[in-house]
Amino acid sequence: MAYKPSSVFLNGSYWGIHNIREKFDKNYFSENFNADPDNIDHLEYSRTETGTELLIVEGTMSHYNEMIDYLMSNNLNDPAIYAQVVEWMDIDSFIDHLVMTMYCANTSWGHNREWWRPRTENGKWRWLIVDLD
């Protein structure tokens, strides 16, 4: 994720150095992954007034729900079952996400999780690292 440090002044008062970061949106996925911006699924767990909720940022949740139902209903020790899951999700991205979350002792992981996929025949779910402070 690209960022640029900047000095922030509000009404003449210095507020320190802040990092301006790219936003995870359809333009980010288009520019960084060459994904069609109108054909992505982007989901996030976020805090809302009623608690932490799974929200649709772009696209739909149907492919994700299908994958989760499959995971919950099948035994991943079966090589054929595991092979199907590998077709749906980028396993390395998921592992990287878990390792980074644990290594950084990210305490806000419960409400700061995002993942996305290009809505194509071979589009796999990939996880994003957000808000490690």
Report each predicted region and the residues it spans.
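Zinc-dependent metallopeptidase catalytic helix centered on the HExxH motif
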Residues: 11, 100-133
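Short beta-strand or tight-loop elements
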Residues: 4, 96, 111
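ATP-dependent phospho-/nucleotidyl transfer catalytic cores
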Residues: 13-15, 19-106, 119-120
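Short, well-structured beta-strand/strand-turn elements
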Residues: 1-7
